Amino acid sequence: MNRPLRHIAIFCGLLVLALLLRANWLQHVDRQELAQHERNARVRFERFSTPRGDIIVGGKAITGSKETESRDYAFRRTSKEGPMYAPVTGYASQSRGTSLLERTYDSVLSGQDDRFAFRHAKDILTGQPRRGGDVITTIDAKAQKAGYKGLTDLGARGAVVALDPRTGKVLALVSTPSYNPEVFAGISFKESDRFTALEKKKDKPLANRPL
């Protein structure tokens, strides 16, 4: 074999080796990350296959789940006083994924956390549907409402954060202008367009100003 052909053969061999190593990396190292990625359809289906757990403020749920007619997305997220609490909860959208508490505690809210394994086994034996777990916040409903009302009455673009000086617990987390996570919680093109419209607004309602 002459020298140019030998160089080409070596190059092709190295290229094949690199591709094999990359495929092996994806299969064995990145498998878990890819399996849990938000763009993975299976992840999205599982997230909305059962009622999500609630996010709790002052002993009351400020989120919920509503049954749909979709086979793939059996439930969609609902919000109570959505604009006031959006800087706390974030959103859980069938088309846009999750943010803030909805993302941080997604495995708990969707019931996929390993700590629920025993409960899921019990539910299967008793014929109960799988349930998500609740997330209890330190937010004080009165403080949150006062901060939100103060900013909206002024028509201001700003933020309010209130902390307990003794413990550091977050009592209020307000950002205005805000948005209602429920209006784009579904998978429809119309709801996706609503999210896009919010992204394009000059006053940036999706921005979480306290953070």
Predicted region positions:
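Extracytoplasmic/periplasmic proteins that interact with beta-lactams or build/remodel peptidoglycan
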Residues: 1-159, 173-210
